[in-house]
Design a protein with these regions (language model features):
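Amphipathic, Lys/Arg-enriched alpha-helical "gate/interface" segment within cytosolic domains
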Residues: 2-135
Length: 135
C-alpha cells in the first residue's frame, strides 16, 4: 500500500494553522498545529475523505496536541462539514492536550462515533484498532 502525506497550510497568508494528513498503516492520521480556521478544517476534511475513499479506511486519529483553541465558530464549521458526510462512516479518536480543546472536540463531533483522549496517542490508537462500527 502506498503512503500518502498531505500538508495543508491554506492558500493564503492569513492561515493561522497547519494540518498534515497521512495514511499510517490502517489509520488515517490528521495532525493540526496552531489555530485552525474554517478553511483549514475544510481542506483537512477533504484530504481525510480522499484517503477514506482511496484507501478504504474509516478510522481517523486527530492529533491536536499542538493545536491552539480557535473561536467557537470554527468547531461549528466542522460539525456542518460532518453533516454532509452522507453514507461515509468514520470512527475518530481525538487526542487533546487540555480540557478546553476536549470541550471544543465534543462540540465539533457531537454524537458521532468518536472518543476524546487526553495526551494519550497510544490509547487512542488502541481504541481505533478495536473492532468498531467503522473500519
Amino acid at each position: 500500500m502506498a503512503a500518502y502525506r498531505v500538508l495543508t497550510a491554506g492558500r493564503d497568508h492569513r492561515m493561522k494553522g497547519q494540518a498534515w494528513v497521512e495514511l499510517v498503516g490502517a489509520l488515517i492520521v490528521a495532525r493540526v498545529r496552531g489555530e485552525p480556521t474554517e478553511e483549514l478544517l475544510r481542506e483537512t476534511q477533504d484530504q481525510v475523505l480522499f484517503l477514506v475513499q482511496d484507501a478504504g479506511r474509516g478510522k481517523v486519529l486527530y492529533d491536536t496536541l499542538e493545536m491552539e483553541a480557535p473561536p467557537v465558530d470554527v468547531p461549528w464549521a466542522q460539525r456542518a462539514l460532518d453533516e454532509k458526510l452522507g453514507p461515509t462512516k468514520l470512527r475518530r479518536a481525538i487526542v487533546v492536550p487540555n480540557s478546553r480543546l476536549a470541550y471544543l472536540a465534543r462540540l465539533t463531533f457531537g454524537e458521532g462515533d468518536y472518543r476524546v483522549f487526553y495526551n494519550d496517542i497510544v490509547l487512542a490508537i488502541k481504541w481505533l484498532s478495536e473492532d468498531g462500527a467503522s473500519a
